[in-house]
């Protein structure tokens, strides 16, 4: 336990995926303000989020993003979907469109959102280097790439003198841990930080869902009533996942009794204290939300201490239960 207490806590990044979709501009402004008031400074968005509304809303908040005197870091991504690609022209179009929406001269971190298997990666990386030389972004990031692709990209960039990626954003939570086996050693070798998305498994690890719910009428959320819902159900909505959650809930009751933390709190505490994320390496957890109340609850949980060993063991048991059907971290 002393090792856990002394370990540097991973940073927290605000995930802006729901801005412009489940959160309107005033709510998004309140959420951003609450996040920054807690002392956090980094916001994650993407060209594709809410069809551009996420970036547009963030750009209208008066944060002076990308300015030399701005303490807020802004991250965005280019995607090879919906008529876009990672070819040089599309890459430039997406980044320059993002800069206009965000009303900033450059972003702090520019990700390749996922691999473009129809474009030679050398073309994409050369174009990224050119955009970096033009001052349009500070750091290069990768997301949803396989470990071997990360190694290939780092080697190509190094040998050609191109900007090297320094951040990898990937799917990671207490019951989705495929990244630990091969990706994490790769990232440590090449010196990339890891930013975790889906820390609550799209909301499944809040414990508010039941497996049978998929057959009934559901409110709009990550699993129902939106463009990405089927992808999230395919990723997480499996009987073994719900059995794993039940194991953890039982352990929470046994360890804490009437004062047991919520499933959400326990899951986030696992991320910050018991996962393989390391604050000393600059790793971070991306916290998404669909309301101000949800963000405040998640931020409070992120500031709490380590879990009882029996609960950590239960999370490990849950992981072993679902390992065989863990969704791939790469695309």
Curated annotation (Swiss-Prot):
Supply the alphabetized keyword list.
Cytoplasm, Detoxification, NADP, Oxidoreductase, Phosphoprotein
Q: Looking at the record's lineage, which domain of life comes first? A: Eukaryota
Q: Does the keyword Cell membrane apply?
A: no
Where Phosphothreonine occurs, the residues are 227
Question: Which CDD domains does this UniProt record tie to the protein?
Answer: AKR_AKR7A1-5
Subunit field text:
Homodimer.
Q: What is this protein called?
A: Aldo-keto reductase family 7 member A3
Q: Which organism is it from?
A: Homo sapiens
Gene name in the database record: AKR7A3
